Amino acid sequence: LLLGCVQRCFDPSVSTATVKVLQANGFEVVIPADQGCCGAVSHHQGELELTRQLATDLVRSMNAVEGDLDAVLVAASGCGHTMKAYGELLNGKAAFRAPVLDVQEFLADRGLLESFRAQLQPLPGVVAMHDACHMIHGQGIQAQPRQLLRAIPDVQLREATEAGVCCGSAGIYNLVQPEEAAELGRIKADDLSSTGAELVASANIGCTL
């Protein structure tokens, strides 16, 4: 499991919860202690040489895991989008020995155990799903997060009218173009608010922040 630099700093509870869910569904989770940055931020900045070095180091770290490796999982879509592009970035010189998957596509594909479903507490209320650009456009993942959310008893999912519109984070766009990013954020917030949702679910730490 990749922890993600920004996620580790700003909301480590995401990784903690991810590990708990995976273990509760029968999966062994390995977190290499020497894992570094995936290179997403430097990639956004166009620093390709630094990105390639970070990517090479991360591949080495993940491939050093002992025993069978079914997947390299990511719980931040910005990281996952970059890691899935390593083949092109590294020109085939280094590659993970297992596929890179967002944790949601992994769980949706493998299925949730009935013992896990039985432990899920009801969440009465309306939830809107925010589709991160790096997930819906970059990785083609849209149905899986909704499938998992619907496993929660009593949850009501409502769709925003502009689900595919950027929230303004866009990698580092909110840092280099703060005014334009803030306007995109306002549009996104208005759209999500119009659903009447009490909660907004997001699968990317950049969007959440």
Name each model feature, range by range.
Residues 2-209:
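Iron-sulfur cluster-binding electron-transfer modules in prokaryotic oxidoreductases
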